């Protein structure tokens, strides 16, 4: 980790307040929160957004975890991939789909919602735009409310991935991607 990992005892009053608010919904800060804790005002703004996309948005848990992994792989964010790949599989995403994504291959999807989510996310991430066909298919399948949540989730998960990579958040596991070692492409 490029920034010091702060213990509760090292925090100033403002950081302790933020830590305590965070602990109401989750345990102690880990992953990106270890970085955000250095800016408690930012962490106070990001935490509710994170909670929304992780726990409360209009997409099923399976697609929340799947989407987080799709975006994490795009950004080579090993920490978030490692923290969520097993959750995605436990929620019902086939392990072979996750293996393909980890290897940088487009999976053969059995579930339409996973295929639509993946196609939408990869279009916006790779080209910065979404085709009319992909947008219309996603709107028809998910409905407008869940589609807007999907768009927001791709943006939030991108921010999360960037924070994890820029701060080089400790992985504490075997690297999940064959083409990434440390925080560099091989």
Predicted regions and their residues:
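Hydrophobic alpha-helical segments
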Residues: 1-186
């Amino acid at each position: 980790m490029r920034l010091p990992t702060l213990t509760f005892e090292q925090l100033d009053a403002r950081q302790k307040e933020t830590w305590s608010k965070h602990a109401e919904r989750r345990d102690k800060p880990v992953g990106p929160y270890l970085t955000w804790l250095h800016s408690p005002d930012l962490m106070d703004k990001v935490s509710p957004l994170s909670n929304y996309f992780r726990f409360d948005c209009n997409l099923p848990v399976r697609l929340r975890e799947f989407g987080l992994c799709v975006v994490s792989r795009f950004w080579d964010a090993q920490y978030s991939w490692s923290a969520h790949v097993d959750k995605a599989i436990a929620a019902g995403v086939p392990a072979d789909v996750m293996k393909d994504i980890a290897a940088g291959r487009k999976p053969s999807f059995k579930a339409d919602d996973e295929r639509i989510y993946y196609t939408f996310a990869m279009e916006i991430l790779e080209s910065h735009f979404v085709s009319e066909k992909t947008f219309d298919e996603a709107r028809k399948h998910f409905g407008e409310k869940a589609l807007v949540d999907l768009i927001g989730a791709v943006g939030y998960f991108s921010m999360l991935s960037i924070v994890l990579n820029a701060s080089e958040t400790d992985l504490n596991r075997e690297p999940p991607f064959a083409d990434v070692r440390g925080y560099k492409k091989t």
